[in-house]
């Protein structure tokens, strides 16, 4: 009997047939190759056993070699069909487990059907749900609640997508909200200043990211309501408070959350994909663009879209801990549906890198978090979050740290760039430079702004890219111009 469009019995028959075909493909390969080889041996020189090049390749290939050389049909079907039928059988068992789960009265969302995971275990769901509910009114003792929360996080991390989604559906909004309240409150109690409460931010975010990546789309709004800290605020940004970015002239009449229609990638990753738009985080976006230029594959491998539509980005936190940060797909958007945050040319991957950074970054000098917390800072501070490696000032002179100053020698920057490093520079906050820079740099030069190094000319000039995007052409700068109009060269290694 079909279950929401899936007929487990018919799928099992198909999987068994594929298994049989896969196991017989080697025999078919050898017989076909033997026939073609015999034909070839009985033909005059210069003639082929077959006009089909794929069949002609089988001449002499009597034994299919699955591990060495080029794999040819039909012998190569053994591995491919074997993998396919094994995956189908695992998914069928999961589907049958969901059917049984529903018969027992558990909620089952369509988004969890036919996943490649273990069948759901009702006891694991019941245990995790009971422990979640028991947090209400529980006496956590003198050592605080962290050990209890660690236990529940471990339980939640161990649930399959189907199990976790059933728990999310059955759990009350009140229980989920109280769990979030306990997770986020790390203060000591008044009676015992040495107890441990809540979970550290990285551990908390890791558990919630795993949950958000697994649950069905139907449960995402419920998750958002229970765990609002998994959405970075934009109400503390200049774009929200002032209606735009006064440096690049972009403006808006209001910001709201909306999901873009563009894919993560259209033509892979390129620095030219990146357009900073209205948030004032040029320091981060310049570093991201420089990294995309140096190692586009590293950037592309660091982001993925989950089956439920959420997006996960690879981020290191300020302590060097590596994790995948999961977020909903909606982005800050203006009244006309245009992106407010960093975006690409018909592709959305830069926006999610920025959103993940806004969730994680906690080093703002004013204590701000979210998008407002990543406005106006130092490019090298973004390096540990992007790569797990520290960024460095490029300096020269001095003794024992005294008297050092910016190394503005273009050849020094070229040496760092040629060694594989991402190199960024900044401009002073100087109104006179804003008014009196070389006209050929229009519209790309701006004071109090960050740039990334794109390359160097044969005659010793440096080429700088503006994170505002491809509408702002790279500028070519001589040594004298660099000394006057730029400062703060920094660099970081690419993994």
In which residue ranges do the predicted regions lie?
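Helix N-cap and loop-to-helix transition residues
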Residues: 7, 160, 172, 216, ...
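Generic detector of well-ordered alpha-helical segments enriched in charged/polar residues
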Residues: 33-36, 56, 60, 78, ...
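Non-catalytic all-alpha helical scaffold/repeat segments
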Residues: 105-234
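N-terminal secretion-targeting helices of virulence/extracellular proteins
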Residues: 1-154, 162-169
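Predominantly the structural core of cysteine protease catalytic domains
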Residues: 229-250, 258-295, 310-456, 463-495
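Acidic helix-start/capping segments at beta-turn-to-alpha-helix junctions
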Residues: 35-40, 304-315
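Surface-exposed patches in mature extracellular/periplasmic domains of secreted proteins
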Residues: 296-305
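Generic beta-strand structural signal
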Residues: 305-306, 456-458
């Amino acid at each position: 009997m079909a279950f929401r469009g899936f007929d487990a019995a018919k799928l099992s028959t198909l999987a068994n047939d594929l298994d049989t075909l896969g196991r017989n493909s080697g025999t078919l390969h050898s017989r076909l190759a033997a026939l073609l080889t015999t034909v070839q041996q009985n033909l005059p020189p210069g003639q082929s056993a077959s006009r089909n090049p794929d069949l002609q390749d089988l001449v002499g290939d009597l034994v299919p070699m699955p591990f060495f050389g080029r794999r040819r049909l039909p012998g190569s079907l053994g591995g491919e069909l074997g993998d396919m039928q094994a995956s189908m059988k695992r998914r069928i068992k999961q589907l049958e487990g969901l059917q049984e789960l529903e018969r027992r009265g558990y909620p089952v969302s369509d988004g969890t059907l036919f996943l490649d995971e273990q069948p759901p275990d009702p006891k694991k769901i019941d245990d995790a749900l009971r422990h979640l509910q028991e947090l209400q009114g529980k006496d956590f003792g003198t050592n605080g609640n962290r050990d209890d929360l660690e236990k529940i996080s471990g339980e939640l991390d161990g649930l399959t997508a189907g199990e976790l989604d059933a728990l999310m559906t059955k759990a009350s909004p009140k229980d989920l909200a109280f769990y979030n309240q306990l997770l986020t409150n790390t203060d000591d109690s008044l009676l015992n200043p040495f107890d441990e409460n809540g979970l550290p931010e990285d551990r908390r975010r890791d558990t919630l990211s795993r949950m958000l990546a697994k649950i069905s789309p139907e449960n995402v709004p419920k998750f958002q309501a229970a765990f609002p800290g998994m959405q970075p605020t934009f109400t503390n940004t200049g774009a929200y408070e002032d209606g735009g970015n006064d440096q690049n002239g972009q403006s808006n009449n209001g910001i709201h959350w909306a999901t873009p229609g563009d894919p993560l990638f259209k033509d892979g990753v390129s620095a030219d994909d990146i357009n900073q738009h209205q948030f004032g985080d040029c320091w981060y976006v310049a570093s991201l663009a420089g990294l995309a230029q140096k190692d586009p594959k590293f950037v592309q491998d660091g982001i993925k879209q989950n089956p439920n539509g959420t997006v996960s980005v690879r981020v290191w936190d300020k302590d060097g801990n590596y994790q995948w940060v999961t977020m909903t797909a909606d982005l800050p958007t203006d009244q006309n549906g245009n992106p407010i945050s960093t975006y690409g040319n018909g592709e959305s991957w830069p926006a999610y890198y920025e959103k993940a950074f806004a969730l994680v970054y906690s080093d703002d000098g004013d204590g701000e978090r979210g998008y407002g917390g990543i406005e106006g800072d130092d490019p090298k501070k973004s390096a540990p979050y992007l790569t797990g490696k520290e960024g460095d000032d490029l300096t020269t002179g001095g003794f024992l740290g005294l008297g050092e100053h910016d190394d503005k020698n273009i050849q020094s920057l070229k040496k760092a760039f040629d060694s594989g490093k991402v190199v960024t520079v900044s401009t002073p906050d100087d109104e006179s430079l804003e008014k009196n820079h070389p006209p050929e740099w229009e519209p790309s030069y701006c004071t109090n702004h960050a740039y990334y190094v794109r390359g160097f000319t044969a005659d010793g000039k440096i080429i700088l890219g503006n994170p505002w995007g491809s509408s702002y052409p790279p500028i070519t700068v001589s040594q004298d111009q660099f000394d006057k109009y730029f400062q703060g060269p920094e660099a970081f290694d690419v993994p």
